[in-house]
Design a protein with these regions (language model features):
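Short, well-formed alpha-helical segments that are part of the catalytic scaffolds
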Residues: 17-33
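Active-site-proximal specificity loops/subdomain of glycosyltransferases
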Residues: 47-88
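Conserved nucleotide-sugar donor-binding
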Residues: 88-89, 198-221
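Short beta-strand-to-loop acidic/aromatic patch adjacent to the donor-nucleotide binding site
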Residues: 89-99
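Conserved donor-nucleotide/metal-binding helix-loop-beta segment in metal-dependent transferases, i.e.
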Residues: 101-141
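C-terminal catalytic/acceptor-binding lobe
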Residues: 222-318
């Protein structure tokens, strides 16, 4: 196993995405020094060999290596594939929308991972619960009762965010909705494997973990959105497995401060305040940033329950 220098920085590049996403990520690397040495690897999902070679040439100044994956499965499965091939000492995984916001961002994550007793670190975490949401949306007893808007309005707010993420491409929007609906149909069969609120989980948009620890976890194949839900926020999620090993799962803010799972809400990184503590942004944090008061209240309560504390813009579309 390679144990040299800094972490292996793995960025998920999808051929199906807007190419500006990869360009924006590379520009962030140029503009915001990571604060530590790193090995950059593009996990190139759905690229042909010719397309991959062209992309790597275009980004030659940031010195990336590339590994091509078929356009199937979801992000976590690709990350596990990279780790299996490279076997580096530690990794920082970023999804396609990952956008570092401050200088020294990678050094802050890496320093947190090296703290005694820490097993996994992330730029954001959440307590949001899919089972509690499903119960609430069906007018059943739920921890969200009295905290979220009435179910019809809450469902409309979620749908608006999904459509926003899909963009103006109607086909992409339809595909996104079909994937979401299929996952929701499958979830009742998996409900016992998911956690009710508070379902502590580090979000996998930007996280770090060592290879040795990754090998100790039970990692199933990620074929569907349901598989991804289970690994990110289920009873046997990455976060829960790490915690059961007696290791901390922490969120790191832009100042480098570290928060254990009981205090993630104080980090001001995800759907809280103005997200002023956020170290690495993504499309979900952007949905909150651009949202009006109604959306911000909904997202903050969904993630943090009674500890929700959104900053509400005076005038902004919801």
């Amino acid at each position: 196993m390679d144990t040299g220098g800094g972490p292996c920085l793995v960025y998920l590049a999808r051929a199906a995405n807007d190419p500006d996403l990869v360009r924006a990520f590379a520009e962030n690397l140029r503009r915001l020094p990571a604060g530590t040495d790193y090995e950059l690897v593009l996990a190139m999902k759905g690229f042909s060999v010719v397309e991959a070679e062209r992309q790597l040439r275009d980004l030659a100044d940031v010195n990336p290596a590339g590994i091509i994956f078929a356009d199937e499965g979801l992000d976590l499965g690709v990350y596990f594939g990279v780790a299996a091939q490279l076997q580096r000492e530690r990794y920082c995984f970023l999804n396609s929308y990952g956008a570092p916001l401050v200088e020294g961002w990678l050094e802050k994550l890496d320093a947190a991972l090296k703290l005694p007793g820490v097993g996994m670190v992330g730029a954001t975490g959440s307590w949001a619960s899919i089972p509690s949401w499903l119960a609430y949306s069906r007018h059943l007893p739920s921890a969200y009762r009295g905290l979220l808007p009435e179910p019809r309005v809450a469902r409309q707010l979620r749908l608006a965010i999904e459509l926003e993420h899909a963009g103006t491409d109607k086909r992409a929007a339809a595909d996104a909705l079909r994937t979401r609906l299929r996952a929701l149909r499958e979830l009742p069969d998996q409900i016992t494997h998911l956690q009710r609120f508070p379902a502590h989980h580090l979000r996998t948009n930007a996280f770090m973990i060592t290879h040795d620890l990754l090998q100790r976890l039970r990692l199933h194949v990620v074929h569907s959105k349901t598989d991804a839900y289970l690994l990110e926020s289920g009873r046997n999620s990455l976060t829960r497995q790490v915690q059961r090993l007696g290791l901390a799962t922490v969120v790191v803010d832009r100042a480098g401060a570290v928060y254990d799972h009981e205090y993630w809400d104080r980090s001001q990184t995800l759907w809280q305040g103005d997200q002023e503590g956020l170290l690495v942004a993504d499309n979900q944090t952007l949905a909150y940033e651009r949202g009006g008061a109604e959306r911000r209240r909904f997202l903050s309560a969904y993630a943090w329950g009674q500890r929700a504390n959104p900053s509400l813009p005076s005038k902004h579309p919801s």
